[in-house]
Each structure stands twice: as structure tokens, then as C-alpha cells.
């Protein structure tokens, strides 16, 4: 089943043989993809939690998952995901491409709203054995990591800078018009749905709402004020506990 479902990209199969990296690496049963898949599929919940770091880089994998959730990257838990390893034992998920991000499907059509979840079946591999177990068994750790991400760069302003200021804004509007004339205008009835221009206003709305929704999944309550006012209707001594 592994040979039919996975493709070795590097090193080239012509150089190392078709089984390298799939069943085991150079005959070593303690390395390779089959070892990881068997662990993911067959381990008990207790063993999955206890031994996860013997198979995956945990911090990296959980952050990858949260990034995919936060940006609605519906193909990046399977079809558009690769697995990297440097020693044959510890694996890292990696983006293959990111064309399904911030509401778009892989044809460039605005498809997904801001409140999508895996449980609803929107992700290409919504029932993935790996990712459903990561989601359910590491939820408390995901909450902690998500808070760290949100407070250190994974925020609306920073994402808009990367997406829009550093990239989209550098493309003149006239280029979108010329692109339309060549690619979409002659085939308007078929491709009009993906002639979105810069999609600037849509991106602003979608990204802001998606982050707020994902915050609810991981118990994050952002504060947008630098001060807090509390009114107490009593003259008695009070104690306030802030977590």
C-alpha cells in the first residue's frame, strides 16, 4: 500500500532503488516510511502520545498543523504535503505547494468560508489517521503552541504584510487586466470565477475572520487594548486572579 500511495522525490529512485525510503532505508527496519506509517496507524493512543517524538519532530509537526488550520490550507494535510527526513527516523511534514490557502480551492476559485473545520470534511484528508490523532490527542499542547504563535508573528498585521505588502501590492493593477485579457476574457463563461484580481478586500476580510475563528478552536483570547478598566460595586476588600 505504501508504494501505491507515496512517491520518493529525493534522492532519485533511479539512483537508490524503488524501495529506498518506502519499506525501509537500505534494509534497516528501524528507519523509513513504513515504520512511521505502522506506528501512526497501529499504536494505541497511549503509545502514540508517549513515543510520537521517536517518529516525528513534535514541535515542528504541531506548528505545521496549526498553520494549516489557521490559514485554511485544505490540501496541505495530505495531497500537498511531503515528508522529509534526514536520518530515516524523525520525519517533518513539508508544504508541497500552497494553492489552497485563504479560501481558494486548487483551481483558484473562492470556495471555503472562514469557519471550516476538519470534522466537516473540508480538508483533503479530513479523516487522516495521523492528523486526527494529532488534533485530538495533543489538543492541550496545541493550545499552548497556538498562543505562542499568535503572540509572536502569527497575527493579522504580520500576515497581511507578507501576503499583500511584500507580494500582491508589488503587482500593478494593469497586469491583472492584461492577464485577464489573455487567460480569462476569451473563455469568460468557463474561467470568470477565477478572475479575482488582487482579491485584496476579500483577503482582508477572510484572514481577519479566520484568525478569530481559529482562536475559538484553541482557547485563545487576544487583547487589543493596552489597558484594562475594572469597576467594582463594593467598598469591601477584593481579590482578582488573572490567569
PLM regions with names:
Residues 21-78, 82-235:
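Middle-to-C-terminal accessory/interaction subdomains
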Amino acid at each position: 500500500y505504501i508504494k501505491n500511495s507515496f512517491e520518493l522525490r529525493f534522492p532519485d529512485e533511479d539512483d537508490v532503488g524503488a524501495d529506498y525510503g518506502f519499506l525501509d532505508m537500505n534494509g534497516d527496519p528501524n528507519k523509513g516510511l513504513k515504520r512511521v506509517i505502522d506506528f501512526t496507524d497501529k499504536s494505541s493512543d497511549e503509545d502514540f502520545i508517549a513515543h510520537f517524538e521517536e517518529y516525528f519532530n513534535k514541535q515542528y509537526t504541531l506548528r505545521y498543523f496549526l498553520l494549516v488550520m489557521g490559514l485554511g490550507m485544505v490540501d496541505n494535510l495530505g495531497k500537498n504535503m511531503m515528508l522529509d527526513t534526514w536520518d530515516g527516523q524523525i520525519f517533518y511534514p513539508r508544504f508541497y505547494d500552497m494553492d489552497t490557502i485563504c479560501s481558494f480551492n486548487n483551481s483558484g476559485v473562492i470556495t471555503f468560508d472562514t469557519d471550516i473545520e476538519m470534522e466537516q470534511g473540508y480538508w483533503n484528508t479530513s479523516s487522516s489517521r495521523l492528523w486526527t490523532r494529532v488534533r485530538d490527542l495533543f489538543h492541550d499542547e496545541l493550545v499552548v503552541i497556538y498562543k505562542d504563535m499568535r503572540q509572536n508573528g502569527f497575527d493579522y498585521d504580520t500576515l497581511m504584510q507578507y501576503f499583500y505588502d511584500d507580494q500582491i501590492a508589488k503587482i500593478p493593477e494593469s497586469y491583472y487586466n492584461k492577464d485577464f485579457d489573455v487567460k480569462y476574457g476569451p473563455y469568460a463563461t468557463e474561467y470568470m470565477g477565477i478572475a479575482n484580481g488582487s482579491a485584496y478586500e476579500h483577503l482582508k476580510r477572510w484572514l481577519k475572520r479566520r484568525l478569530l475563528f481559529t482562536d475559538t478552536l484553541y482557547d485563545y483570547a487576544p487583547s487589543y487594548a493596552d489597558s484594562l478598566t475594572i469597576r467594582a460595586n463594593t467598598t469591601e476588600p477584593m481579590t482578582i486572579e488573572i490567569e
